[in-house]
Amino acid sequence: EIMPSLVGSEMCIRDRYKVNYSLSGASIPPDAKTFSVAYFPNNAPMVAPILSSTLTDALRDKFTRQTRLTQVDEGGDFAFEGEITGYTSTTASVSGSSETALLNRLTITVNVRFTNAVDESMSWKKTFSAFEDFDSSKLLNEIEGELIPQIVDKLVTDIFQASAANW
């Protein structure tokens, strides 16, 4: 006799409280319906021609593929804007004996402003940075077409997690 009442109680509790499950790590509030991503201009001192469009498109694609939100041109319930502020190549490691660079590091830094129209307290402004190391025998312009998408993927994952995984 106890068992039916426990099952009934569980059903009442389950029906009363809605829980969002997601394989992507996103937990978007039910009231959020749309998202918008403004073009991210490259304001870094050193500019890579493909970077702005690669970053902007990757962020749009991430939200399209991994959420139920519909993309709009501007004013989405989740709205992203910002700019690329850093694109730098530095020495990552050197040979101890000859002081020769073994690896170089390409680092991309992005300022992002996220507006959550459903819950303003969840809005934020943050700086994200990611990098990839590459063999110092290669010139940056030879390898950046391969490195930029890898770094952008890291940045987009971090931005996505910061905005959609906090619920």
In which residue ranges do the predicted regions lie?
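A short, polar/charged loop/turn motif at coil->beta-strand junctions and beta-hairpin connectors
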Residues: 7, 29-31, 76, 122
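Surface-exposed short loop/turn segments
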Residues: 23, 64-70, 77-123, 132-146, ...
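Short hydrophobic alpha-helix segments
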Residues: 126-128
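Short coil/turn segments at secondary-structure junctions
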Residues: 4, 42-46, 138-146
